[in-house]
Amino acid sequence: MSQLIRNFLIFFLFFSTNAFSADTEFFGKFVQGGVIIGKNKLAKKVFFDDLELELSDEGYFIFGFGRNHKKLSTLKINFSDRTETLNLDISKSEYKIERIDGLPSKMVTPGPELYERIKNDRLLIGKALGKKYKSKILPRNFVWPAEGRISGIFGSQRILNGLKKNPHGGLDIAAPVGTPIKSIASGKVLMAEKGLYYTGNIVIIGHGYKLKSMYIHMEDINVSEGDFVKQGQIIGTIGMTGRVTGPHLHMNVYWNRIKINPELLLEDKK
């Protein structure tokens, strides 16, 4: 059984008028930023808030909740002889808010000469996140991408000179330049690019089932777009490329293009 399954609790939820099958298992936290792995070997189709989920041959499926996900969602499972519906109660997460005033304006908002470059970078990233990769096996355990100190957490937000910036969408691990970066799970490299304004050197990997991981501010990139990688494979090294103040890895995890909390997905830190 995977570390994820060993560490996570099976949560008891509020059932709809239809009794939900005892054969359905859930692993994960029903909380904003959380990700759930479900399993039912008899399921024919599964829907999360009307979105049809991909089912593995073993009956596994995965879905997640963004930073500000609504309180209630619905999961529907179609069987050969019936349909069952479950109402999901999503707990609210608390996020750190930090205010910093007196910064030079260029550190808060980039100048207009950079707008076109930033726009093109975002288009490249959006294209990669929109790519589909199918896998027969749904990843159920995930390894930490690098050794180091956690220097930034999911959901936190800065207010710079009174201007609200986008919430922090991932996990920061501070470590010296050259520290190896590993893929958290097996998958296909959807993007491997250097020199983007905000992200610097960047790799995006698709793991199937609408799940993707992004690694940015890298020094070296050891993979190319289209490569297949194994879990734990070194894909590059930590750097300080892009818009950073020191060497670190910033990693995002996306489900269905929604950022989820990487710490709720990864194994216990060794």
Language-model-detected regions and their locations in the chain:
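Sec-dependent signal peptide recognition
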Residues: S2-F11
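Short hydrophobic beta/alpha edge segments that flank linear recognition/processing sites
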Residues: I173, I202-V203, K230-G242
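N-terminal signal peptide c-region/cleavage motif recognized by signal peptidases
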Residues: S16-N18
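Surface-exposed, glycine-biased beta-strand/turn segments
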Residues: N87-T199
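Short, well-structured beta-strand-loop connectors
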Residues: P180-M191, V223-I238
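Residue-level recognition of beta-strand microenvironments
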Residues: I153, P176, A192, M218-I221, ...
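Cationic-aromatic interfacial patches
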Residues: S21-E94
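Zn2+-dependent peptidoglycan hydrolase active-site motif and core
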Residues: I184-E219, P247, N252
